[in-house]
């Protein structure tokens, strides 16, 4: 197994949008250098479940000469609320954080979303470095500069684009994850295979059991490929004005499921069902072949990801999809495939088409 780190670069229209995603093991020691000499104060935001990890990061920074503090927030989606952001702002204010200081996010995707939002809004923007500890956080939430919190009306409806200064994806942290969380995170990896990199699908089909082994070089390759897909798309379209929409494959229905379930479903599980729905929708209008639609079902099922959802929840899902950020007026828009690695947009003026596709995944 390689001990070398892999650096995947994200570039933008300005130097401020450029940053590195470092994938490797034992990366904590790189954090002080990435923060830089101008930073004096650092707030480490972490969930309750990672208190010891957060304290370790704080102590590492303190030993390097920083004034380091921690802010403990609720686990998972419970942490993505305005009240939690306000608590973090209070800590920053009470400790005299300036524009030259920084925030470090330690945790899964919900933590990087919240910490990024806090950094984006404090003094109109301070440096943030993400240290994702989940598979989902590594391949999705920490890369791309999207930040956000949830409201009663939907997921991530309040947020900002705020690229991190760096991302440290330390693979050692994956060893602490339950198997079902690794499997859930694989949904975002598989998504990258469907929309851009078919080699991801080939690798998963070759050895699906290896995706639950956090020590395997196989899983590392999948992670690096998925990050490379996202880095490529984000480098071209930071603020989702065009191509970046393809990263929302499976997310229109997926976010609606999360809303209906009051965020009790894992994000990856919801996206898995959403991708299956998008495949059936594309098949129904003749844009995706039977073979490619069936490949969705086979790969997702093989990994143990869900591909069906409750038949009696359709109206709630439709209401949730109407709030999707891709919608334009009363027109619902979906990312669909015209083939593997050939994403496109489907505008749906008639919800009966959606209902018919939903019947193919309803249980």
Curated annotation (Swiss-Prot):
Main subcellular localisation: cytoplasm
The record's free-text note on cofactor binding: Binds 1 divalent metal cation per subunit. Can use either Co(2+) or Zn(2+).
Molecular function in Gene Ontology: 3-dehydroquinate synthase activity; metal ion binding; nucleotide binding
Residues binding NAD(+), per UniProt: 75-80, 109-113, 133-134, 146, 155, 173-176
EC number: 4.2.3.4
InterPro entries: Dehydroquinate_synthase, DHQ_synth_AroB, DHQ_synth_fam, DHQS/DOIS_N, DHQS_C
Keywords assigned: Amino-acid biosynthesis, Aromatic amino acid biosynthesis, Cobalt, Cytoplasm, Lyase, Metal-binding, NAD, Nucleotide-binding, Zinc
CDD domains noted in UniProt: DHQS (cd08195)
Pathway(s): Metabolic intermediate biosynthesis; chorismate biosynthesis; chorismate from D-erythrose 4-phosphate and phosphoenolpyruvate: step 2/7
GO biological process: amino acid biosynthetic process; aromatic amino acid family biosynthetic process; chorismate biosynthetic process
Top-level class of the enzyme under EC nomenclature: lyase
Catalytic activity: 7-phospho-2-dehydro-3-deoxy-D-arabino-heptonate = 3-dehydroquinate + phosphate
Residues that hold Zn(2+) according to the record: 188, 251, 267
Subcellular location: Cytoplasm
NCBIfam families (alphabetical): aroB
Protein role: Catalyzes the conversion of 3-deoxy-D-arabino-heptulosonate 7-phosphate (DAHP) to dehydroquinate (DHQ).
PANTHER family: 3-DEHYDROQUINATE SYNTHASE, 3-DEHYDROQUINATE SYNTHASE, CHLOROPLASTIC
Family: Belongs to the sugar phosphate cyclases superfamily. Dehydroquinate synthase family.
Protein name per the record: 3-dehydroquinate synthase
Gene (name only): aroB
């Amino acid at each position: 197994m390689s001990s070398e780190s892999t650096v995947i670069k994200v570039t933008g229209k300005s130097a401020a949008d450029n940053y590195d995603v470092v994938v490797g093991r034992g990366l904590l020691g790189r954090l002080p250098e990435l923060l830089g000499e101008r930073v004096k104060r650092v707030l480490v935001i972490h969930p309750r479940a990672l208190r010891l990890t957060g304290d370790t990061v704080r102590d590492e920074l303190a030993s390097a000469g920083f004034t380091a503090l921690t802010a403990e927030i609720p686990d998972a989606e419970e942490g993505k609320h305005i009240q939690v952001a306000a608590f973090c702002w209070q800590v920053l204010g009470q400790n005299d954080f300036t524009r030259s200081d920084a925030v470090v996010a330690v945790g899964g995707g919900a933590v990087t979303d919240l910490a990024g939002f806090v950094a984006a809004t404090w003094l109109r923007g301070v440096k943030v470095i993400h240290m994702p500890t989940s598979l989902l956080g590594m391949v999705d939430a920490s890369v791309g500069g999207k930040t956000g919190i949830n409201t009663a009306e939907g997921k991530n409806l309040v947020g900002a684009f705020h690229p991190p200064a760096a991302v440290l994806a330390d693979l050692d942290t994956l060893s602490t994850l339950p198997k079902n969380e690794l499997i859930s995170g694989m949904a975002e990896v598989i998504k990258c295979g469907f929309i851009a990199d078919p080699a991801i699908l080939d690798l998963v089909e070759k050895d699906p059991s290896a995706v639950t082994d956090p020590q395997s070089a196989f899983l590392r390759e999948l992670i690096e490929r998925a990050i490379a897909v996202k880095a490529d798309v984000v480098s071209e379209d930071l603020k989702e004005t065009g191509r970046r929409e393809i990263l929302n494959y499976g997310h229109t229905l997926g976010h609606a499921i999360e809303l209906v379930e009051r965020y009790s479903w894992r994000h990856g599980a919801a996206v898995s069902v959403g991708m299956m729905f998008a495949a059936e929708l594309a098949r129904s209008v003749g844009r995706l072949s039977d073979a490619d639609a069936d490949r969705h079902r086979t790969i997702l099922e093989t990994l143990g990801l869900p591909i069906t959802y409750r038949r009696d929840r359709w109206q709630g899902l439709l209401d949730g999809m109407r709030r999707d950020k891709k919608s334009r007026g009363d027109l619902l828009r979906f990312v669909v495939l015209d083939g593997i690695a050939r994403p496109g947009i489907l505008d749906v003026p008639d919800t009966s088409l959606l209902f018919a596709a939903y019947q193919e995944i309803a249980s």
